[in-house]
């Protein structure tokens, strides 16, 4: 039995108006800023330049080690400076609209972010998967997706917009809030908190959207997440999954340096063109070449290839043989993913016996090929099942919202 908590209380129309008025007075968030951006913002707000380096160090600790979401909780910063920071900036969390808890302990959150420009509030989903000895947070990078992979529920939701680095990090910060994963108020100020005992030990960019179509914001967020003076997640515990945006794959290794996962799902171009349509732009030969050239690739830093098992589509032993041949010489792990059904799909999951035969062949060829245990299926939190109700604003709605904002500004 799954548990669902609907955390909304406002009428949608009233909430839209409230967000529209708030956007007129929106303050920039310090969350998601690089140190250089934060320095410029603090100087512009009136912080003396000689103090900036110290203030950044203090803020970084409070935001990313202690996880505070209110300037008033920053106890080693003067009351006057806290008031000035609150006047110019925000560090607020997104609204948690709904929290669902699966029978297996998986948690899915629906987060709502305020509008940007003439947009509307948007919603995205994040998923926490607890396992023995580790806990993985699956993070979204876009609202919706452009890729329309035919087996993926998210692909049925048109792209609304990219998420900012703040919104990407906010998923991690809010999840840690909900799980009690930040230190309590009795922890001494300035203390670095050990990683042992953390509920979130790994993050995967495998939620809604294609991360490499939002490269700069994803890069900024992941560099902050892996910063040793803050959230301090090892880059070996951060995995970025792409459907194959070839030009950005090398940049991912060179500029971010995290683990790479490829949503492969087919070993023949004619089939992958259907399952993962970006293959028409970047076919298998180009994708595999980019993987072979991934910076830092080694047995200690393998690429994960994700392969959803679709009955009578891509699950034959011939497919397994072609898969081994395709990846020959690449340090790799192959995750076999039983297809997770969603409303309206025409695909079926491969029979378990067939999945095991496929896995046995790949294993015998020297590639680790674990069969992923489906998690959170009962709350549509499993791989390929995420989707929110956010849509791109129609022109008539955009004009109405702009009028509402103008009216609000005149109050």
Curated annotation (Swiss-Prot):
Gene3D superfamilies from the UniProt entry: 1.10.150.530, Aldolase class I (3.20.20.70)
Chief site of localization: cytoplasm
Entry binding sites for S-adenosyl-L-methionine: 209-210, 241, 263-265, 340
Subcellular location: Cytoplasm
RNA-binding as UniProt keyword: no
UniProt cross-references to PROSITE patterns, sorted A to Z: RADICAL_SAM
Single GO BP term: tRNA methylation
Cystines in this chain: 138-383
Binding site for [4Fe-4S] cluster: 145, 149, 152
Enzyme Commission (EC) number: 2.1.1.192
Record's cofactor remark: Binds 1 [4Fe-4S] cluster. The cluster is coordinated with 3 cysteines and an exchangeable S-adenosyl-L-methionine.
Catalytic activity: adenosine(2503) in 23S rRNA + 2 reduced [2Fe-2S]-[ferredoxin] + 2 S-adenosyl-L-methionine = 2-methyladenosine(2503) in 23S rRNA + 5'-deoxyadenosine + L-methionine + 2 oxidized [2Fe-2S]-[ferredoxin] + S-adenosyl-L-homocysteine; adenosine(37) in tRNA + 2 reduced [2Fe-2S]-[ferredoxin] + 2 S-adenosyl-L-methionine = 2-methyladenosine(37) in tRNA + 5'-deoxyadenosine + L-methionine + 2 oxidized [2Fe-2S]-[ferredoxin] + S-adenosyl-L-homocysteine
UniProt-annotated catalytic positions: 125 (proton acceptor), 383 (s-methylcysteine intermediate)
Domain Radical SAM core as annotated: residue spans: 131-380
Misc remark: Reaction proceeds by a ping-pong mechanism involving intermediate methylation of a conserved cysteine residue.
Official protein name in the record: Dual-specificity RNA methyltransferase RlmN
Organism this protein belongs to: Brucella melitensis biotype 2 (strain ATCC 23457)
């Amino acid at each position: 039995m799954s548990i669902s908590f609907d955390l909304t209380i406002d009428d949608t129309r009233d909430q839209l108006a409230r967000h529209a008025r708030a956007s007129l007075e929106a303050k920039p968030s310090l969350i998601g800023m690089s140190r250089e951006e934060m320095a410029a913002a603090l100087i512009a707000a009136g912080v003396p330049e000689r103090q900036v380096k110290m203030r950044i160090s203090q803020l970084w600790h409070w935001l990313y080690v202690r996880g505070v979401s209110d300037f008033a909780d920053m106890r080693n910063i003067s009351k006057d400076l806290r008031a000035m920071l609150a006047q110019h900036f925000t560090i607020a969390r997104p609204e948690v609209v709904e929290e669902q808890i699966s029978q297996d302990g998986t948690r899915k959150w629906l987060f709502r972010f305020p509008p940007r420009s003439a947009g509307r509030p948007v919603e995205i989903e994040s998923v926490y998967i607890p396992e023995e000895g580790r806990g993985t947070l699956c993070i979204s990078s876009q609202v919706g997706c452009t890729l329309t992979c035919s087996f993926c529920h998210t692909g049925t939701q048109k792209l609304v917009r990219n998420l900012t680095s703040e919104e990407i990090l906010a998923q991690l910060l809010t999840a840690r809030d909900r799980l009690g994963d930040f230190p309590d108020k009795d922890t001494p100020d300035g203390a670095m908190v050990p990683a042992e005992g953390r509920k979130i030990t790994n993050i995967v960019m495998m939620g809604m959207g294609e991360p490499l179509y939002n490269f700069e914001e994803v890069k900024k967020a992941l560099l902050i997440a892996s910063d040793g003076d803050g959230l301090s997640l090892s880059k070996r515990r951060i995995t970025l999954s792409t459907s194959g945006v070839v030009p950005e794959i090398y940049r991912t290794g060179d500029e971010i340096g995290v683990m790479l996962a490829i949503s492969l799902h087919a070993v023949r171009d004619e089939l992958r063109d259907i399952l993962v349509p970006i293959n028409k732009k970047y076919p298998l030969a180009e994708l595999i070449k980019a993987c072979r050239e991934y910076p830092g690739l080694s047995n200690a830093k393998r690429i994960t290839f994700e392969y959803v098992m679709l009955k009578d589509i891509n699950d034959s032993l011939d497919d397994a043989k072609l898969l081994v041949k395709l990846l020959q010489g690449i340090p790799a792990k192959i995750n076999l993913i039983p297809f997770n059904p969603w409303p309206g799909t025409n695909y079926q999951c491969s029979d378990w016996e067939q999945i095991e035969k496929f896995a046995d062949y790949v294993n015998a060829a020297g590639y680790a090929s674990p069969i992923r245990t489906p998690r959170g299926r009962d709350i549509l939190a499993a791989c390929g099942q995420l989707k929110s109700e956010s849509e791109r604003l129609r022109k008539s709605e955009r004009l109405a919202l702009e009028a509402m904002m103008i009216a609000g500004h005149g109050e």
